[in-house]
Structures are given as C-alpha cells and as structure tokens.
Design a protein with these regions (language model features):
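Short, surface-exposed coil-to-beta transition loops
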Residues: 120-125
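Glycine-rich, aromatic-bearing surface loops/beta-hairpins
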Residues: 126, 131-141
Length: 144
C-alpha cells in the first residue's frame, strides 16, 4: 500500500533504520492465526502477548528510533513517529497488537527488558498487527 509520498512505508522504514534486520509488511493473506502470521514473516512460533494500541504505537516508534542492543539513536524520534504512524495507519483504529516482551515498558529494575526470542538474533522485538481487513508485522533484530 502506498504512503502519502508514493513509497511503500516498509521500504521507507528499511532505508531509515539502516542497522540490524527489519521485517516489515502487510500479510498477503486474509486475517490468520498469530502462528501463521509469525511464520509468514519468518518468526518463530512463540507465545505473543497482546498489548493495547497505545503500547503498540509506542513500541513501533521506540524500535525505529534506537537499536535494541545499546539504545543508540538510529533516527530522530520525530522521524520514527512519522514512519511508524504511516505504517500503522494501514491497519485502522481497531487493530490489535501482539509482541514478545516488555520493550514497550520502562524497565522497573536493573534487570532491564525481558523477551522471548522470535528469531536467532541476540535482540529482537516488534509487533504483529491484526485488524479486520489486514494483518502485518513490524519487527527488528539487532546484534550486540
């Protein structure tokens, strides 16, 4: 689906987040199970936790803004917000969001973030998106 400037939002995301690996796209199939959606984007079949829309949007912005390994800025917060909003609007206001950890939260202790790996990367997280018409994925992988 085209963005406002004629480019695919996922292409723009991949260009702007020029570190690690980015898995981004809209499913080629009608709404499916989370397991099938994860598989379509090359993710392992794990337990994905549902998060609310606000957390889903915040996580999308966070993983575009900085890398997972060292929290180094990859792009400005404004650009990350713009790109994540552009991608997520493809799914509408009733979209549901699923993730593999707590990267969307502020760490409550020195132990930091926890997650269940969905790839073989050292660090990975993102969102699987399910809506009435489309499903999709925005997932990043980083190495230490």
């Amino acid at each position: 689906m085209p963005s406002t400037n004629g480019n695919d939002p996922c292409d723009e995301i991949r260009i702007a987040r020029n570190v690690g690996t980015v898995r981004c796209g809209v499913s080629l199939h009608a709404p499916v199970t989370l397991e099938e959606l994860a598989s379509e984007f090359g993710l392992r079949s794990i337990k994905f936790d549902e998060i609310d829309s606000r957390a889903g949007h915040a996580l999308a912005q966070k993983i575009l803004h900085a890398d997972l390994a060292h929290a180094k800025e990859v792009m400005s917060k404004a650009r990350a917000s713009e790109l994540s909003d552009e991608f997520l609007k493809l799914f509408g206001p009733k979209a549901r969001f699923f993730t593999n950890g707590n990267f969307h939260q502020t760490p409550r202790s020195m132990s930091g973030f926890t997650w269940t790996p969905a790839t073989s990367a050292t660090f990975d997280t993102g969102i699987l998106i399910v809506s009435g018409e489309h499903c999709g994925c925005l997932w990043v992988e980083d190495e230490d």
